[in-house]
Amino acid sequence: MILVINSGSSSIKFKLFDTSKTIEPILDGLAERIGIDGFLKFEHNNQKYKFEDPLPDHEHAIQLILNKLLELKIISNIDEINGVGFRVVHGGEISHSSIITDEILSKIQDSVKLAPLHNPAAIIAIKAVKKLMPNTSMVACFDTAFHQTMPEVNYLYTVPYKWYEEFGVRKYGFHGISYEYIVNKSSEILNKKKENLNLIVCHLGNGASISCIKDGKSYDTSMGLTPLAGLMMGTRSGDIDVSICEYIAKQTNTDIFSITQTLNKQSGLLGLSQVSADMRDVLEQYDRNDKKAVVAVEKYVQIVADFIVKYANYLDNIDAVVFTAGIGENADVIRDLICKKVKLLNLQIDQDKNQAKYSDYKLISSEKSKIPVYAIRTNEEKMICLDTLNLIK
């Protein structure tokens, strides 16, 4: 069995996978409000469990998870868990998932300056598991690793080169675990070897990015040094003129940290629509012809379309355009609006297919479409499980 952990500052999402025959999750859970007034909940065999517990820290939360797995006889002993895979947001220039050694843990620590909101929580969880399960192999799967194949011309910024040499200022990109899963799944769907696969993948969730996949590898992506760059998102601005920060700081007598917080937490769909960070709520107002909601949706769609056209220019041929993540998988209206904006590629959507229910993936383009368009449900936890399994064998 493989335990997959995604640790946040006050929560731990986890899945337990049975890997004996196929790779299937047998338990899906969440430890929430760690350090506040915590509780643990999970689902196993269609039965839901919830346990109130103070959960003073991450170690206590992981101990409770393991205790409940034993109590409920989901596992008979801890050694049945062969490996633990962790989602780590930032790995700097680490290019692949890695067994967690002291050296790898040190590199994750070094990347805290690049992901101060995310990496510390992963480090705490890793140290807790190391203490509670000292004989179990641990693997770190990095959201940045997949994009380490980008050429220098795509990852360097047009700033003094010493900023890269001294401070690591470059494009890293994110959502890499999701992109890796989508590349593998697309290879299977299209019956084409990964190394021959050219895709444009739109990972549209509350956080959103696009990746240009050339010969099965990341060639360019929209997020940058941090997840703030690129597309307009739920609460993030995406790309803006950086001088806006200095201008607003002077106008409002506000420090740069507060401005960055606003760009991360109060911008994007929420900032422009003044309705919500949730695309479903914004689309409700869009249907009612609310002016700000209409502008927000049109802006969102336009930016995604612009990136698709930009990335199409990198590729000699495109095997598919793929939509994934919360909005990409579920918002048929957004998929349709984006494809209509990409006039150069002649993406033709079949409305019946686009609106049809599906479980895993579906083709949403019509026979007239120059390029096939798919909606594919991503599965980052399964990807982490597979990477963990491959590394600990």
Swiss-Prot record:
Where is this protein found?
Cytoplasm
Textual note on the cofactor: Mg(2+). Can also accept Mn(2+).
- One of the GO BP terms on file: acetate metabolic process
Q: Which organism is it from?
A: Mycoplasma mycoides subsp. mycoides SC (strain CCUG 32753 / NCTC 10114 / PG1)
- Report the InterPro entries cross-referenced here: Ac/propionate_kinase (IPR004372), Aliphatic_acid_kin_short-chain (IPR000890), Aliphatic_acid_kinase_CS (IPR023865), ATPase_NBD (IPR043129)
- Can you name this protein? Acetate kinase
Q: Which domain of life is it from?
A: Bacteria
What cofactor is this protein dependent on? Mg(2+); Mn(2+)
Question: Does the record bear Cell cycle in its keywords?
Answer: no
Query: Which reactions are catalysed by this chain?
Result: acetate + ATP = acetyl phosphate + ADP
According to its UniProt record, this protein's enzyme class is transferase
Q: What does this protein do?
A: Catalyzes the formation of acetyl phosphate from acetate and ATP. Can also catalyze the reverse reaction.
Question: Under the cellular component aspect of Gene Ontology, which terms does the record hold?
Answer: cytoplasm
Active site at which residues?
D143 (proton donor/acceptor)
Give the residues the record marks as binding Mg(2+): N6, E380
> Pfam families, from UniProt?
Acetate_kinase (PF00871)
**Its annotated pathway?**
Metabolic intermediate biosynthesis; acetyl-CoA biosynthesis; acetyl-CoA from acetate: step 1/2
Show the CDD domains listed in the entry. ASKHA_NBD_AcK_PK
Annotated residues for binding of substrate = R87
